[in-house]
Amino acid sequence: DSNIATEPSAGVYESGIFTLLSGTEPNEATGQDGDAQDGAPGGPLDLSGNMTVDMGFFVPVSIGSYVWEDLNVDGVQDAAEVGLPNATVALLVDNGSGTFVAATDVDAVAVVNQVTGADGLYEFDNLPPGDYRVRVTPPAGFEATPNQDTTANSDGLAADELDSNIASEPVSGTFESATFTLASLGEPNESDAADGDAQDGAAGILSDLSGN
């Protein structure tokens, strides 16, 4: 288990207080990675050292990135089609029981809804790994394109970055994506050719691989 208790300064983490006494410390678990104490389990050396102070870390994930006006209603972002401004974008997360609720970031702060600008871009970052959905309310007068790709970029190909991922209309005039399972270092590379990519970092480095 992770023993992080505080963050005394940004990016620096500390455990709680451990009082060490000879002959009173935990037995070393057999086969545990990280155990480096000499002596037989339960022996004097083992009982005089605490090998349980482990620290767990992960790479935050992100999701985005584009709401556009589909002029020819084919579900594909063509070169002449531009971003759609004034669309409200919300992020939902599975609460562990299959119910999607408003998302929070890695600091347990509520993720704020975004309103797209003229470029149609949005991005939610600093997220814990999990199952997410994106909910979009377009400006008045706009409807969802009937041709949708709901596979949630399952093949990781750049072409999927151009496809609409709307899967349902839970509320009239509000549209929701399919579920995206985001994992640290497990997401597709962004392509330089696709409008809507707004992720920092070059293809192949950590920040790029942590976004979808």
Describe each region flagged by the PLM.
Residues 1, 6, 91, 130-141:
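A short, solvent-exposed beta-strand micro-motif common in secreted/extracellular proteins
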Residues 119-123, 134-137:
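Mobile, glycine-rich extracellular loop/lid and propeptide segments
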